[in-house]
Curated annotation (Swiss-Prot):
Gene3D superfamilies in UniProt: Domain 2, N(10)-formyltetrahydrofolate synthetase (3.30.1510.10), Formyltetrahydrofolate synthetase, domain 3 (3.10.410.10), P-loop containing nucleotide triphosphate hydrolases (3.40.50.300)
InterPro entries reported in the protein's UniProt record: Formate_THF_ligase, Formate_THF_ligase_CS, P-loop_NTPase
Gene this chain is encoded by: fhs
Protein name: Formate--tetrahydrofolate ligase
Keywords: ATP-binding, Ligase, Nucleotide-binding, One-carbon metabolism
Source species of the chain: Streptococcus thermophilus (strain CNRZ 1066)
GO BP: tetrahydrofolate interconversion
Length: 556
């Protein structure tokens, strides 16, 4: 089997102008970035914004192994298969962050014969969205520090600045830094730090904004610091929301590319799902819904993180609600949840599949709480055995959830036909009756308790002293009615990454909150979740290169 990049480079790409004709996008609707990439103009977005939306399919997964379970690959393969069976389909995905690409992932544009192309460009600088978000974020930092240097008319307490700088790399050395050193001409010394770009609130804002005006309003509502009297300082107080919007005026437009099979793909925005809401942009998803009969999208990590946030945070901003949710599972991950060591996952172990099924079962039950029908997709691997597959199908039958084996990595669209047909059957039965887990009127404590007890399976929530004080403060500021975005390990339902399967009776500890008032949610921090990742001992970057003719090597 060829590597992902070898497969990608063997495909003869069609001009993007030709690819998008099938969904009614013309040449004048595009802002081209070469022959194979484009941004969609606001003229076209506005032209279709009142059209009736098509069907929406959300792809999520069980709690993943460190290698991931193939959500993006399955999403792409499903979209290709839907097109192959005659359903006009688009896909809406997140764009990858360069940090993890250079770190552990090596690439994030699908895999095998289910990829979005050109994968080298998408994984590297693409159309410059990450650069624009990084620049806007750091422009805010520079303007904030300049305000303090020039007299601090707003009375900002430099000890209580909560806005950090960002860079689109994994760089642990930048987590805690001191700025303003070198004497009075260089600013006022203070502690600062860097997050990875995809953790920036500006990334979340870009992905939730519905147009330029909404983007500007959300940017204005960002809290950057507190005054000496402990009242919040917003971007609007600095009067710089216009400048930040200007920097992002092109980045807000969705990017168009194609799959190996020529399915039009909107790839736009990329917040992490463990420290942010983990979904691609509202603009991309909404536009796809109005251009196609079926839209396939994904939410990051497992359904306890990405799908919950998609349904509680993103869906209220969409023109329609999901018609079906596809939960991707792999037998290797189920065996890991069943107690098998990572080194032994390739060995047949039917009992471990049965034991690990508790994880998948809870995810199915959780999605049903939102009133949406579920389909399980088994992402097929070479080491899977007939006995293990039969056991999983039997277990799914017992809880009355349809299940299909999919081999889109190896077989592309053909490997997803059975899954596509099952999804269409579920969608066209029209059983979806979406409801949020909590209401806006619930307090922050109530929202978190519902997520912990009903989604995670936990017993209760423990709020540390700082979090308790913040709850009182946030209520005074009127922030207590915002949705909650849980920052939690992706590997477990709990806040302990080693507690696999479907644990019960545990507590979730909230150590502090981070207000993301521009994005419109409050982040609750649990465990040791990092907003600036580090690199592994042997980063993927060590195997990357470029040939004399400019061909990328080592992306996978």
């Amino acid at each position: 089997m060829k590597t992902d990049i070898e497969i990608a480079q063997s495909v003869e790409l069609k001009p993007i102008t030709e690819v998008v004709e099938k969904v009614g996008i013309g040449f004048d609707d595009l802002e081209l970035y070469g022959k194979y990439k484009a941004k969609l103009s606001f003229d076209k977005i506005n032209e279709v914004k009142d059209d009736k939306p098509g069907k929406l399919i959300l792809v999520t997964a069980i709690n993943p192994t460190p290698a991931g379970e193939g959500k993006s690959t399955m999403s792409i393969g499903l979209a290709d298969a839907l097109n192959k069976i005659g359903k006009k389909t688009m896909i809406a995905l997140r764009e990858p962050s360069l940090g993890p690409v250079m770190g552990i992932k090596g690439g994030a544009a699908g895999g095998g014969y289910a990829q979005v192309l050109p994968m080298e460009d998408i994984n590297l600088h693409f159309t410059g969205d990450m650069h624009a978000i990084t620049t806007a974020n750091n422009a805010l930092s520079a303007l904030l520090d300049n305000h303090i240097h020039q007299g601090n008319a707003l009375g900002i307490d430099q000890r209580r600045i909560i806005w950090k700088r960002v860079v689109d790399l994994n760089d642990r050395a930048l987590r805690h830094v001191t700025v303003g050193l070198g004497g009075p001409l260089n600013g006022i010394p203070r502690e600062d730090g860097f997050d990875i770009t995809v953790a920036s609130e500006i990334m979340a804002i870009l992905c939730l904004a519905t147009d330029i005006n909404d983007l500007k309003e959300r940017l204005a509502n960002i809290v950057v610091a507190y005054r000496y009297d402990r009242t919040p300082v917003y971007v609007r107080d600095l009067e710089i929301e216009g400048a930040l919007t200007l920097i992002l005026k092109d980045a807000i437009k969705p990017n168009l590319v194609q799959t190996i099979y020529g399915t039009p793909a909107l790839v736009h925005g990329g917040p992490f799902a463990n420290i942010a809401h983990g979904c691609n942009s509202v603009l991309a998803t909404s536009t796809a819904l109005r251009l196609a009969d079926y839209t396939v999208t994904e939410a990051g990590f497992g359904a306890d993180l990405g799908a919950e946030k998609f349904l509680d945070i993103k869906t209220p901003n969409l023109p329609t609600t999901p018609d079906a949710v596809v939960i991707v599972a792999t037998l290797r991950a189920l065996k890991m949840h069943g107690g098998v060591a990572k080194t032994d996952l390739s060995e047949e172990n039917v009992q471990a599949v049965r034991d690990g099924f508790s994880n998948l079962k809870r995810h199915v039950e959780n999605i049903r709480k939102f009133g949406i029908p579920v389909v399980v997709a088994i992402n097929e691997f070479v080491a899977d055995t007939e006995a293990e597959i039969a056991a999983l199908k039997e277990l799914c039958s017992e809880i009355k959830v349809p299940v299909e084996l999919a081999s889109v990595w190896a077989n592309g669209a053909d490997g997803g036909i059975d899954l596509a047909n099952t999804v269409v059957d579920v969608v066209e039965n029209g059983n979806a009756d979406y409801k949020r887990l909590y209401s806006d009127d619930d307090s922050l404590e109530e929202k978190i308790t519902k997520i912990v007890t009903e989604i995670y399976g936990g017993k209760s929530v423990v709020f540390e002293k700082k979090a308790k004080n913040q709850l009182k403060q946030f209520a005074e500021f009127g922030w207590d009615k915002l949705p909650v975005c849980m920052a939690k390990t992706q590997y477990s339902f709990s806040d302990n990454q080693f507690l696999l399967g479907a644990p019960e009776g545990f507590d979730i500890t909230i150590r502090e909150f981070v207000p993301k008032t521009g994005a419109g949610f409050i982040v609750a921090l649990t465990g040791d979740v990092m907003t600036m990742p580090g690199l592994p001992k042997a980063p993927a970057a060590l195997k990357m290169d470029v040939t004399e003719d400019g061909t990328a090597v080592g992306l996978f």
